[in-house]
Amino acid sequence: MASAASVTSLADEVNCPVCQGTLREPVTIDCGHNFCRVCLTRYLEITSPDPEEPPTCPLCKEPFRPGNFRPNWQLANVVENIERLKLVSQMDLDEEDVCPEHGEKVYFFCEDDEMQLCVVCREAWEHRAHTVRFLEDAAGPYREQIQKCLECLRKEREEIQEIQSRENRRIQVLLTQVATKKQKVISEFAHLSQFLEEQQNILLDQLEKLDEDILKHRDEFDVLVTGEIGRFNTLIEELEEKKERPARELLTDIRSTLIRCETRRCRKPVAISPELGQRIRDFPQQAFPLQREMKMFLEKLSFELDYEPAHISLDPRTSHPKLLLSEDYQQARFSYKWQKSPDNPQRFDRATCVLAHGGFTGGRHTWVVSVDLAHGGSCTLGVVSKDIRRKGELRMRPEEGVWAVRLAWGFVSALSSFPTRLTLEEQPQQVRVSIDYEVGWVTFANAVTQEPIYTFTASFTQKVFPFFGLWGRGSKFSLSSQEGAATLS
């Protein structure tokens, strides 16, 4: 069955161009256009054309002969069929609003049974005690509920789309970082390859020199040994001949002969001199600098591939009056004695904390904090957002713009939404703090053993600053962009 929309579209195609209604007794003129017979007759009467000039088509303005329009029976049949389709389509629409049980039009809605009712259904005993409303009245609250659901769904969809966009940005940042690291590795290993080739040539030259010295000593040794063997052969032949002579000849000069044999001492030549042997034994030590260079190279490459060392200093404008800063602003010590400091807006007045200068709005940065806690003391390390609360109580958790860990006497805690005591192999004395702004990571690790401590995941939208908190008489910390930061003396 044709839909109402398709029937309406088809009916528009058989409208009269004059009256804009459905063609009645359609007739065709010379140009091929169709009109109602009555409409075309009236058109000819109104225009009253000059007998010398033929009338023109109302649609295309082509002239036609007034007595030459003819009935279009085929089009008339099409119009009749379309009229029937329109009627059937209307009946189908009406049937949708009819009660299937009683054949009456549906006007009501039972909220208890969630049923659509006609007048007869409305008066039935099973619905008399129910809440029954007109369809439009009943639909109103449901429309409102649907609207609320739509608002919630759209909001959740926007949140998911925002998450998708943010995560896609993070992925792109990571891909960019990987590409950069690839180039870094290629470049560094190209330099390493050149360095190794140079070192290889140096070591091979040294080995070649040792080889030449050994061969030289071998030749000298062969000459010396050959000479000694020749002298011994001569003496042996002389004695063998002496031994076979008669007694009178044997005893002639026998004493000098024996003395010459007894005083003859064999010089025991050495093929490899002690000095050359020591050079051979010492050769592996020539590779030690190479091993050290390799270790330093790998450590440097690993560090540079991770983060850019941040050369930070403490900001005295933010320091709590109980914190004593060094002149170079690289160290801080807790003191119960209040320092004379102006109460400017940037300064913490209750939390014994201090920020670093500068802050970050992007990139990957790292710094090391050496911590020396007195008994019962604590030190808080991390990053905070630019608008962190400076006056009054400071709640240290991510919701307040604080991503930090706290080192206390004997334990370490992550200051997440609910502080979490961490299990570590050892209490860190030096902590590496690292931030990847675009990816949203704040990472803590033992700067000596490289043991991971904790990682926060965040979404930074404004500048963040390195953050430090300190408590306990005698507790102190110092800063460094590299490992091995010195503690306060």
Curated annotation (Swiss-Prot):
A zinc finger (B box-type) spans 94-135. Zn(2+) binds at C99, H102, C121, H127. CDD domains: RING-HC_TRIM10_C-IV, SPRY_PRY_TRIM10. It is found in: Cytoplasm. GO terms for biological process: innate immune response. Pfam families: PRY (PF13765), SPRY (PF00622), zf-B_box (PF00643), zf-C3HC4 (PF00097). Keywords: Coiled coil, Cytoplasm, Metal-binding, Zinc, Zinc-finger. GO terms for molecular function: ubiquitin protein ligase activity; zinc ion binding. Its main location: cytoplasm. A zinc finger (RING-type) spans 16-61. The keyword Phosphoprotein does not apply. GO terms for cellular component: cytoplasm. Residues 292-486 form the B30.2/SPRY domain. Residues 142-245 form a coiled coil. Belongs to the TRIM/RBCC family. E3 ligase that plays an essential role in the differentiation and survival of terminal erythroid cells. May directly bind to PTEN and promote its ubiquitination, resulting in its proteasomal degradation and activation of hypertrophic signaling. In addition, plays a role in immune response regulation by repressing the phosphorylation of STAT1 and STAT2 in the interferon/JAK/STAT signaling pathway independent of its E3 ligase activity. Mechanistically, interacts with the intracellular domain of IFNAR1 and thereby inhibits the association between TYK2 and IFNAR1. Interacts with IFNAR1; this interaction prevents association of IFNAR1 with TYK2. This is Tripartite motif-containing protein 10. It comes from Bos taurus. The lineage of its organism: Eukaryota, Metazoa, Chordata, Craniata, Vertebrata. The gene is TRIM10.
